[in-house]
Amino acid sequence: MSGYARPLPRVTPDNLPFWEAARRHELRLQRCGGCGRFWHPPGPVCPDCLSERCDWTPVSGRGTVSSFVVFHKAYFPAFADAIPYAVVQVELEEGPRLTANLVEVPPAEIRIGMPVSVVFDDVTPEISIPRFRRAP
């Protein structure tokens, strides 16, 4: 049993390839075989052209912070030891936006437009959670 006490992501048939790739420390998103659009969160059809043809394609993991919040209060007991912690929305170079924790950056230094890159947190043997840190 893992010592990780925070909620784990719910793995579904639609998002299973995302979590399998994350476990290998790869960031993969769905890409439409019809129009070429990347999208996230995962789903059964392209949100632009409604094509059911999609592939799970590796993406760069690089992007910029488009929005953020810093939590100074633990709304759930499992997060009390992390206060303060940042949650960012990152616009990836490929277009989609992902919401994740920002790590290794003091809250006062977080800025909209800050370049970031993905890192993976191996929270259990089965689950690696994508997070972001300041890009080198």
Predicted region positions:
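Short, conserved beta-turn/loop elements at beta-strand boundaries and strand-helix junctions
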Residues: 68-73, 121-123
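Short coil-to-beta-strand transition motifs
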Residues: 55-64, 110-114
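Well-ordered alpha/beta subsegment
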Residues: 95, 99-136
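Short, basic/aromatic beta-hairpin or loop at an interaction surface
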Residues: 82-98
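A broadly conserved sequence feature marking short terminus-proximal activation segments
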Residues: 1-27, 134
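Short, cysteine/histidine-rich loop/knuckle motifs that typically chelate Zn2+
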Residues: 31-34, 45-51
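Residues immediately within or flanking Cys/His clusters that coordinate Zn2+
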Residues: 26-29, 43
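Short functional micro-motifs and their immediate structural scaffolds
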Residues: 40, 53-55
